[in-house]
């Protein structure tokens, strides 16, 4: 009988060793909470920076790695000062002359490497866009548009508009110079009666892979219509005929008037 009573006690001790109870054992060994770590990221700002040729720029590379990291900026541009803080590094880039430069920030955190990219564009808006008044040469008009101090010329499109409608445009992509340049566009046109007092304008547009820079000239107008020799001869004949008709009609009325008076 005693052995029968001891068996449950032994089983209880085996289930809860060290004299603990079910409630005490749960309090001593709570379940471990699940922890989800944030994904490792790297950012480079601004992602697109525009500067004048020969200018400088600052790019900021930031990350969320809590550990000491190794970071570097990879670019063909000349680097200047470096300023860093907790989770970020700022890099200075000097003498930017290429119209389009790619920059990469590479960060390694706990053996994992990530990178972010940015682009620096060097450009110069035209200092001026000037359309000269039309010049009559022979029986056609010559238009000249001057675009001054612009870069890069290879991404420039110059167009002429009459009354808001494009009558001519030219892309200068064949030019590959790396300096500021002046551009002159010459266009010869005929004009009709409908072109009189229509505003003529010249427009310069830089297309820089997503960045569009526009400039335009003040309007000029056609105030005199150029006529060909045939047109002049026809007009002279028409005028002479009209004058003759008017003189004949006038003579008839004069004779009738004199007859009535007598």
From Swiss-Prot:
Keywords: Cell adhesion, Cell membrane, Disulfide bond, Glycoprotein, Immunoglobulin domain, Membrane, Repeat, Secreted, Signal, Transmembrane, Transmembrane helix
Glycosylation site list: 60, 84, 182
Keyword Phosphoprotein: no
Cytoplasmic side: 253-262
Bilayer-crossing regions: 232-252
Any Pfam family matching the protein: ICAM_N
Domain Ig-like C2-type, residue spans: 54-116, 138-209
Function statement: Adhesion molecule that binds to leukocyte adhesion LFA-1 protein LFA-1 (integrin alpha-L/beta-2). ICAM4 is also a ligand for alpha-4/beta-1 and alpha-V integrins. Isoform 2 may modulate binding of membrane-associated ICAM4.
Similarity remark: Belongs to the immunoglobulin superfamily. ICAM family.
Name this protein carries in UniProt: Intercellular adhesion molecule 4
Protein species of origin: Mus musculus (Mouse)
Gene: Icam4
């Amino acid at each position: 009988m005693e052995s029968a009573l001891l068996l449950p006690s032994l089983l209880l001790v085996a289930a809860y060793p060290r004299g603990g109870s079910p409630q005490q054992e749960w309090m001593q060994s709570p379940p471990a909470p699940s922890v989800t770590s944030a994904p490792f990221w790297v950012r480079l700002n601004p992602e697109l920076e525009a500067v004048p040729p020969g200018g400088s720029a600052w790019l900021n590379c930031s990350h969320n790695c809590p550990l000491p990291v190794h970071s570097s900026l990879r670019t063909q541009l000349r680097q200047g000062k470096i300023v860093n803080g907790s989770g970020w590094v700022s890099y200075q880039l000097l003498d930017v002359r290429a119209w389009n430069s790619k920059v990469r920030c590479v960060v390694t955190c706990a053996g994992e490497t990530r990178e972010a990219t940015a682009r620096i564009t060097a450009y110069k808006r035209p200092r001026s866009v000037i359309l000269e008044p039309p010049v009559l040469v022979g029986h056609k008009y010559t238009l000249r548009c001057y675009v001054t101090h612009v870069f890069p010329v290879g991404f420039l499109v110059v167009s002429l508009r009459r009354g808001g409608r494009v009558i001519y445009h030219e892309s200068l992509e064949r030019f590959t110079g790396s300096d500021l340049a002046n551009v002159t566009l010459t266009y010869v046109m005929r004009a009709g009666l409908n072109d009189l007092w229509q505003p003529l304008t010249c427009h310069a547009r830089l297309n820089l892979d997503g960045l569009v820079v526009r400039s335009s000239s003040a309007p000029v107008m056609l105030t005199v219509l150029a006529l060909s020799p045939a047109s002049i001869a026809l007009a002279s004949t028409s005028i002479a005929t009209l004058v003759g008709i008017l003189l004949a009609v006038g003579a008839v009325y004069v004779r009738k008037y004199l007859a009535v008076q007598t």
